[in-house]
Each structure stands twice: as structure tokens, then as C-alpha cells.
């Protein structure tokens, strides 16, 4: 089956690998040549991923039978709508359904309208004075969010990126003047986690839970990035998450998909809920209308099923199952020095693939070209899969040593110390649970 994959990051390399393993004849459109995908693809179209016309032309040329959309920007550009008009089914929501991610205000209002569990208190402002007055009256720490896509880097939280509510008002004013509107939310304290599901618009199949490390530097400090790494556990939960917490988070996504169908925006593809586990339970931080990056790499590394068959089930409305191995995973992203604010670009790195393989680790390429030249974003990920988290972390850590150049990574991704730190946060919030160190 001829399958088109849109996107060329680490997430897409992992998707492409799984599709080819499932028997797909792969064709890729991306704005750079990912060396991992180049080995997998029958043909590779270089084009802007949001240029719908170019993507459609490429799909026509090769007689594509199914498309799989990796990143969020093409979804916002209406790539799925255009492909479907061409008679090409796509794994990914339409432009209208993708608003769950692409328009944060719409998503919050949708949750409110449909009484979706895990909601946060929020307000949307287009008037600077009203916004300032409301924040003063509210008096508690807030979160400030632009309404559209920011690559995970536009959200600022009081007590983290913002010193206090005074700074929050300044930042919110800047967004109103730039975009016309701003979203203000209550701050929720706790530990974040990711739940991703496959859905055909009715049936919902959860994937193992994953925890991401968004901060650039060890100890969870520094600027927010696209994600410096992530881990998952062999029991598909996380050390601080009970079966009950998981069920509640899943209910949020199930009710979301049901409400989208009722509102006339059937949602098919991957839905990813970014949750905060608070003392009271899981609260939805935001929806994403596609796989997470790095989180896709974790779950696809343990997918014990055929991704091509799952993709067909999604587009045909006949989704049945998705099995995952009971293994732990650790993904460590390697980024250019200076990332995310001022990354080094244009310099080649050295990758000893044989050495990485001999350690039992796996390499996933991201923002490097076919010559392994740094393109300015996260360059590649090293993946460890094992029976225990400790062993998976050791494999990934050993694999990293075979990559040389002006790069950095977070040593603490998936380590026992960093996991225990998260368990401690939940205990301080009064959460009662029996931690498992997977």
C-alpha cells in the first residue's frame, strides 16, 4: 500500500519505521531530508509541509492510497481536508477538528460547553484593562497562553517563566497587542504526563503513558523546549499514577471524542492529552491533535502490532486493537548547543551507528540533513528499551556517547533520581499512592 507521510522530525522517523515494518510502501514530504526517512522512503519530496498544493501534487504523482500526518502545522493548514477531497484518506483530524490544538480558546470553550472532565478555570480577553483588572481580582497565580500554535514555547506560568502576576499582565498585554486575544488560566500544581490515543471517531484505544522533560537543562530548569526526552514504564502507567488516575484521564479523551462527533466535527487520528496530575486528580493542560515528539518514539518502540493496519482501521472507522509490549522505554534527545534560543546550525556531527546498535540502543533522526548537518532544532534521539526503566535508561545513556559534535543532552532523563523527584512532588500535594519505580 502506498502511504504518504507528511513531516521529517524524530516523531516522523519513528512513524515511518513502524509503517514500513507493517508493510507500507513509504513516500515522504518534508521541508528537509531526514537521513532515517531517506532510507525508508521510495521517494522523498522536499516541500513546505504546510504547502497543501505541493503535498497534493506529490500524492497525485505517486498514486498515494493513505496519508499519515506527523506535525500540527499542516493540520491547521487543512491538509486532511484537501487530501480527502482528492479521495485520499488521512490519519489526522480535519482543520475544524484540529482546533482542539490549533485554537486554545476554542478548545477550552468546547470543554466547558460539553462538561468534559478535567477542565481548568479560564478567561479569554481582548481588552487590556479588563484583563489587568481580572488578574488583580483573581489574586492567585495564573498561566498565560497565546491562542494559536507556538510549538509548545509560547505558554508562560507564574512561578516558572513569569515572576509574578505583574509580569503575567505585561506578557498578556504583549499577546493582546500582537494577536488581538489572550487566554488566561488558573495555575495547576502537580506533575505533567502524556496520554495518547488512537481513534476512528468512535473507538478509543489508549497507548502507554509517557512523561516528557520539557526544560532544556538538567534538574528541570531553563527554557521550555519541544522536549528533551521522555520515558514510559513496562506496566504502561507511571510511578506516581494509579489505575484510577489513568482511567480519569482516559475518560477526558473519550468524552472529548464523543462530544466532537456530536458537534459535527468527527475526530480521527491520534489525540494526545497533556495532563497535570494535581492533588485532586488529572487536569487537562492542553490537547494536541497528533503524536507527541518525543512521546511517539516511546510508544512506537513498544508497539506490538501493525501500525499500517491501525492506520487503515482509523480511516475506515473499523479500529479494533493495538497491543504494546510490557517494556520500559527511555528517549534522550540530543540538541545543538544554544538550543532552543540560539542554536548552532550548519555544523556536521558524527554518529557511530554501529556503536549505538551494539549498545542495544536505537537512533531516531530529527533536525539534521542527509549529511548530518545540524539544522537548529533537536538533532536526533537515542532510544533504550528494556524490562526495567533503569536498564532502558542505561542503554540510552550509553548510546548517547557515540554522537560527537557541538551538542548537549539531559543526562537525567529517565533516571531514578528524576523519577523520585516527581513522586516527592505528588506526595507533598497530599496524593496517596503506592509508587512503582517501573
From Swiss-Prot:
Mind telling me which Pfam families this protein's record contains? GARS_A, GARS_C, GARS_N
- So, what pathway does this thing act in? Purine metabolism; IMP biosynthesis via de novo pathway; N(1)-(5-phospho-D-ribosyl)glycinamide from 5-phospho-alpha-D-ribose 1-diphosphate: step 2/2
Q: Where does ATP bind?
A: 135-194
The protein's matches in Gene3D superfamilies, at most eight in alphabetical order, are given as:
3.40.50.20, ATP-grasp fold, A domain (3.30.1490.20), ATP-grasp fold, B domain (3.30.470.20), Phosphoribosylglycinamide synthetase, C-terminal domain (3.90.600.10)
Sites binding Mg(2+) 1 sit at 274, 286
> What cofactor does this one take?
Mg(2+); Mn(2+)
For the keyword Magnesium, the answer is yes
Which processes are annotated in GO (biological process)? 'de novo' IMP biosynthetic process; purine nucleobase biosynthetic process
Name of this protein: Phosphoribosylamine--glycine ligase
Q: What is the lineage of its organism?
A: Archaea, Methanobacteriati, Methanobacteriota, Thermococci, Thermococcales
